[in-house]
Curated annotation (Swiss-Prot):
The gene is clpP2. This is ATP-dependent Clp protease proteolytic subunit 2. SUPFAM superfamilies: ClpP/crotonase. It comes from Synechococcus elongatus (strain ATCC 33912 / PCC 7942 / FACHB-805). It holds the Pfam family CLP_protease. It is an enzyme of class 3 (hydrolase).
């Protein structure tokens, strides 16, 4: 039995409060790339300065991001990170943050299968949007550790696809889409506890949910709220 709300995961709280005693307070710079601005964290240590892109820095805290559509390149990157973190510590949880409109079913299933196979629990956290394959991966997190931020949106639907060519080619592609539809619906029923018949009806069209609705549906277990902040006598913010 889980409460409707929970504070942010421990790694996020540690980063927010600056509690990593191994490093001095990092300086943050931004580097403009062709697609987006990727911040670089410059950390001071006894051995001098070291620079990390923000995602590599968060990977050290066992935090992985899925912040784009799902394709083979994205799947390869996330699978590699999950396997690396398992090799580093097979008992410590991994956090997978999801803000994704979905994408390739086969690429998404590669991520999903790896999530189920690695030894550590993979906690999933939705921020922004988890739609289509993004919502499926959100539901595939470790039981009790599937979460969403309060303003997130979650959407499930059936696989989409198209085909052209001779009639037999179209028939082959149609069978493949129906196979993926059946597989995804079966797994969604397993992860949510909903009857398969309800999953089939709800995924027939785009089915949007708020975090609270997704929790009631069984897609997630907790809705995250902002940690309570207290101000110390020295005006330093600390987490309660």
């Amino acid at each position: 039995m889980f409460s409707s709300h929970a504070s942010l995961p421990i790694h996020s709280r540690r980063l927010a409060a600056g509690l990593d005693s191994r490093w001095q307070q990092p300086q943050i710079q931004a580097i403009a790339g062709s697609q987006a601005i990727v911040p670089t964290v410059v950390e001071q240590s006894g051995r001098g300065e070291r620079a990390f892109d923000i995602y590599s820095r968060l990977l050290r805290e066992r935090i992985v991001f899925l912040g784009t559509g799902v394709d083979d390149a994205v799947a390869d990157s996330i699978v590699a990170q999950l396997l690396f973190l398992e090799a580093e510590d097979p008992e410590k949880d991994i956090q997978l943050y999801i803000n994704s409109p979905g994408g390739s079913v086969t690429a998404g299933m590669a991520i999903y299968d790896t999530m189920q196979q690695v030894a550590p629990d993979v906690a999933t956290i939705c921020f922004g949007l988890a739609a289509s394959m993004g919502a499926f991966l959100l539901s595939g997190g470790a039981q009790g550790k599937r979460m969403a931020l309060p303003s997130a949106r979650i959407m499930i639907h059936q696989p989409l696809g198209g085909a052209q060519g001779q009639a037999v080619d179209i028939e082959i592609q149609a069978r493949e889409i129906l196979y993926h539809k059946s597989t995804l619906n079966d797994l969604l029923a397993q992860h949510t506890g909903q009857p398969l018949e309800k999953i089939e009806v709800d995924t027939d069209r785009d089915f949007f949910m708020s975090p609270e609705e997704a929790k009631a549906y069984g897609l997630i277990d907790q809705v995250l709220t902002r940690p309570t902040m207290a101000i110390t006598d020295h005006n330093d913010a600390v987490l309660q």
